[in-house]
From Swiss-Prot:
Reaction proceeds by a ping-pong mechanism involving intermediate methylation of a conserved cysteine residue. It comes from Rhodococcus jostii (strain RHA1). Its EC number is 2.1.1.192. This is Probable dual-specificity RNA methyltransferase RlmN. The lineage of its organism: Bacteria, Bacillati, Actinomycetota, Actinomycetes, Mycobacteriales. Signal peptide: none annotated. PROSITE patterns: RADICAL_SAM. The gene is rlmN. NCBIfam families: rRNA_mod_RlmN. It comes from the Bacteria. Specifically methylates position 2 of adenine 2503 in 23S rRNA and position 2 of adenine 37 in tRNAs. Binds 1 [4Fe-4S] cluster. The cluster is coordinated with 3 cysteines and an exchangeable S-adenosyl-L-methionine. It is found in: Cytoplasm. It catalyses: adenosine(2503) in 23S rRNA + 2 reduced [2Fe-2S]-[ferredoxin] + 2 S-adenosyl-L-methionine = 2-methyladenosine(2503) in 23S rRNA + 5'-deoxyadenosine + L-methionine + 2 oxidized [2Fe-2S]-[ferredoxin] + S-adenosyl-L-homocysteine; adenosine(37) in tRNA + 2 reduced [2Fe-2S]-[ferredoxin] + 2 S-adenosyl-L-methionine = 2-methyladenosine(37) in tRNA + 5'-deoxyadenosine + L-methionine + 2 oxidized [2Fe-2S]-[ferredoxin] + S-adenosyl-L-homocysteine.
Length: 369
């Protein structure tokens, strides 16, 4: 039985990692380079090495004078994440990486290859304070926020691994990034938004992915959703709703006690209107808990009323977690749920589940060494 944990919005005051180039915007980069006594053009040069060439080791930056590489490395390229181990499944198409941060904190990212794309699922916090009882990350509690650079470096490392053919399937290109790993992204708001800008800005300011290929998920921090809408980004917003009624959601997603289903959907509509993007509604289907036909009908009705055509439901067969008494709904129940949501005029599909065997699927990340 899952133990009821308190909600934690503010991360413990643990020391953040040393400053890294990826923490800095272009003006801050120039200032940092000037402080090292180097000419201003080195700022963009270093950024191109990191973002365009995916190089994080100044010793390998051949356009940088050998005499200053050590100094630059110490000041702007501290080692943030060290891989502890890689686990693969799905014929090698899914790879989970356990990372150790500078202070020993553990976190995970998951790279998934498909015939037409490669998607990286990244963490924004070590652990999570949202306390959802069916999620292994939420049951582990919150250790600390990740820095902007720790978030970005997960992406750079995956892009480099794909480019170099270090993952199954040969050389490839990273096409999508989803903030669906460990943590509640909007509880680490400032650093996550900065990371999104680094991931999507063209070189020398970032990795150059399209904003439309980035998804930011949330359990429903309504004020932060509105704030994100006002950033004028065109990333996809994914809301982990999991049930359409407040009574059950208060238990399944404890943050609902702070912001109700109606408030979350109002904020999601504001995001859809501002961004012009369809909102994704995530719904983990749990046997005999939230899979009843009436809940499917209510979900469809509420979403159609709140979001009209600007919504898509992703049904997720519940992934097993240690100690949980819950499991996935039977396939016929899942099929009927989809049919009923569609009957309300709302787009709905079942998500392709990857990584169950290596605890890399949605809700399974626990960063266990």
């Amino acid at each position: 039985m899952a133990v009821s944990l308190p909600l934690v919005f503010t991360a413990p005051r643990r020391g953040m990692p040393p400053k890294h180039l990826a923490d800095l915007d272009s003006a801050e980069r120039r200032e940092a380079v000037k402080e090292l006594g180097l000419p201003g053009f080195r700022a963009d040069q270093l950024a191109r090495q990191y973002y365009a060439r995916l190089e994080a080791d100044p010793e390998k930056m051949t356009d940088l004078p050998a005499a200053v590489r050590e100094q630059v490395g110490a000041a702007l390229f501290p080692t943030l994440l060290t891989p502890v181990k890689h686990l693969a499944c799905d014929g090698g198409d899914t790879r989970k990486t356990l990372w150790k941060a500078n202070d020993g904190t553990l976190l995970e990212s998951v790279l998934m290859r498909y015939p037409d794309r490669a998607t990286l699922c990244i963490s924004s916090q070590a652990g999570c304070g949202m306390a959802c009882p069916f999620c292994a990350t939420g049951q582990g509690g919150l250790q600390r926020n990740l820095s902007t650079a720790e978030i970005v470096d997960q992406v750079r490392a995956a892009a480099a691994a794909l480019r170099d053919g270090d993952v199954h399937g040969g050389p490839g290109r990273l096409s999508n990034v989803v903030f669906m790993g460990m943590g509640e992204p909007l509880a680490n708001y400032k650093r996550v938004v900065a990371a999104v800008r680094r991931i999507t800005s063209p070189a020398p300011d970032g990795l150059g992915l399209s904003q439309r290929s980035v998804t930011v998920s949330t359990v429903g921090l309504a004020p932060a959703i509105r704030k994100l809408a006002d950033e004028d980004l065109s990333v996809t917003l994914a809301v982990s709703l999991h049930t359409p009624d407040d009574e059950l959601r208060d238990t399944l997603v404890p943050v609902n006690n702070r912001w109700s289903v109606a408030e979350v959907l109002d904020a999601a509509r504001y995001y859809a209107d501002k961004s012009g993007r369809r909102v994704s509604i995530e719904y983990a289907l749990i046997r005999d808990v939230n899979d009843q036909p009436w809940r499917a009908d209510l979900l469809g009705k509420k979403l159609r009323k709140a979001l009209g055509p600007l919504v898509h439901v992703n049904l997720i067969p519940l992934n097993p977690t240690p100690g949980s008494e819950w499991d996935a709904s039977p396939k016929p129940v899942e099929k009927e749920f989809v049919r009923r949501v569609l009957a309300q005029g709302v787009s709905c599909t079942v998500r392709d589940t990857r990584g169950q065997e290596i605890a890399a699927a949605c809700g399974q990340l626990a960063a266990e060494n």
